[in-house]
Every structure is written in C-alpha cells, then in structure tokens.
Amino acid sequence: MPNIKIKAIDIYHPNHVIENDFYINHFQKKGRDIQHFLEVMGREKRYVIDKVEENGLTMALEATKRVLERAGMTGKDLDYIEFSTQVPETTFPINAMYVHAEIQADHDTIIKDSNANCAGMTVAVEQASRYMLANPHIHTALIVGSDYNSLIANPEQEITYANYGDAACAVILEKTDENTGFIDASYHTDSVFKDKINYPAHGLTKAVKGKSDVQAINWLPFDGNVALPPTYKMIDQLLARNGLSIKDIDACCFSQFALSNILKIQDHYQIDQEKIIYVGDTYAYTGTSSPFIALYEGIKSGRIKRGDNVLFWTIGSGFQIVAMLYQY
C-alpha cells in the first residue's frame, strides 16, 4: 500500500527585519503600551517585505525554486501544484499558474489555488496527501504557502500590525512504498467568529465600488480560548484512532500565532519542551505557512529527524481547527 511522504521542504523570507521597538514606539504615539501583548504573542522580530518588486507571489516562486533544487527535481517532475494563500497577488489567473510557468511544469500537471486562511497550508498538505493516495496517476506534488501579511496589516491594531511577518514555505510530497509519511488528520469548525476578522473589512463588493476601505484587515476582539477545548478533544481522538499517545509524538509544529496558545497546549498534554518547535520569536506570525516553517526549522536544527512522528495544529479565522499527523 502506498504512502505519501514529505520529500523536501524549503522557505523564503525577505531580508528586511523589524524588531519590537518599532511597534512599541508606533503604538506609544497612539497612547498604547503593547509590551505585554508582544510577550504574550512571543514576538521579538519579524521579516517584512520592503521592496516594491516583492510580494506573496515572488516569495512563493523563490521558495518553490529552492525546494525543487533541494529535492533534485524540476518542474517537469511534478504532477500536482497547489498554492495556498489568503493574500493572493491575483485572482485571475490563479497564482499557481505563475508557479507552473516559472518552473516550466508539464501540460498535464494539475494546478490550483486554495484558501483556508491561516489553516491553509496544513489543509492543502492533508488534502493533497489524501488525493494522491486515491489517484494512481499522481506521484509528486508541490504545496507552496505564502502570505504577504504586512500588506494588509492594520496599523491601528497591534494584533496584525505588530504580530505578522512575511514568508513562504514549499514542500514536495512524494508517493512511496516506505512505511512513513501521512497518517491522519482531524477538523473542528465553529462559525461563531465569522464576523470578527474580515478582509476586505465590509466585503469585496463595497471595496471595489469605493464604499469601504480595502487597505487593512479589520479585527474585532473575541475570546480565542474557546478554541482550546475542541482542540484537546480532536487531538485526543486523532491520536486514539491511530493507536498513538502524546508520548509517541516526537515533535509539535503548531500555529505560531501566539506563544500563549502553544504553552497552553503544551501544559495540557505535559509535552517536553524539546518537542515544541517555536519560531514565532524569529519569524513572527506568517499565516498559512506557519506550522511548516516550524517544521523546516525543526529539520534544519536536527530536532526533527526521518521517522519522527510530527503533530501539526493550526487554526483559521472563523474558526476552523486542523490537527494532522505525519511521520517525517
């Protein structure tokens, strides 16, 4: 029986670094102290696009070229390309079309864009893995996630402006006879917060017709802790139905949105610190690519090795939670 493994992973981020002091000073001028906020979120610095020629698509193209080189492959070797983003550079054509052209993929390569907000790349990898298992003609897939978050971050709201960074991550999935790779995934969706995080703030129609601001995300306050009980339930179910316990997990690549969330999950399951891959102090929050940048850094540092069981967890606005098990 075939399995789907992560053959290679690579990333791209801009060179420009902004540290916390910039944002502390920015909000002090507005009469607000955000130092505690930055501690809770676990921020120190972030990579931010500062060149007009860079955007979410260019980051994705660079990450794609890097992962193909790492895998020893070309665009001709790909059967499937999926671009995950919540900040597409274009809607016509899809961004994956530009990836296809840049790497000169074949005419029979399947391409698509997808958007599950911050849960996007995890959803894309999970669903591509299942599709590859079902389709005998698909042997390799490129999943690239890229968000130009600073483009639409709201300078009046620290939850985006001081919290986000820009980056892209690309993975190559490969069908294999090895006893490794994709294991399972679980979802929980509750639409209770569907009107709390909006871009465009009042919908595309009003933005295009000039009746609403299109410049920034509008983020209204809500209690994100409500997502934790279903998180514990779905992780418990995911582990149980695959005959695993939390002690069988070798590494945790969670959403880097807030360090406080990671610490709560870690405390709930009593996960050893060395198993928690945290990169939010370096990259800040990169949106769709967030758990996979953690995977990349875990592999790079030697904390994640071939054969390790990796638990992914992330959340998309609205909200949708995704947990996924992969044997790297």
Predicted feature locations:
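Condensing-enzyme catalytic core mediating Claisen C-C bond formation in acyl metabolism
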Residues: 1-52, 157-225, 233, 328
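Conserved beta-ketoacyl condensing-enzyme motif
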Residues: 6, 52-116, 238-262, 266-268
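Buried hydrophobic positions in well-ordered alpha/beta secondary-structure cores of metabolic enzymes
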Residues: 6-8, 37, 67, 78-81, ...
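Acidic, glycine-rich active-site loops and adjacent beta-strand->loop/helix elements
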Residues: 12, 84-89, 116-119, 145-151, ...
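Short acidic, glycine/serine/threonine-rich loops at helix termini
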Residues: 18, 92-93, 125, 152-156, ...
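Acidic-glycine-rich active-site phosphate/pyrophosphate-binding loop
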Residues: 31-39, 90-105, 143-149, 204, ...
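Claisen-condensing/thiolase-fold acyl-transfer catalytic domains that form or cleave C-C bonds
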Residues: 57, 61, 87-88, 101, ...
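Flexible, glycine-rich active-site loops centered on histidine and acidic residues
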Residues: 133-167
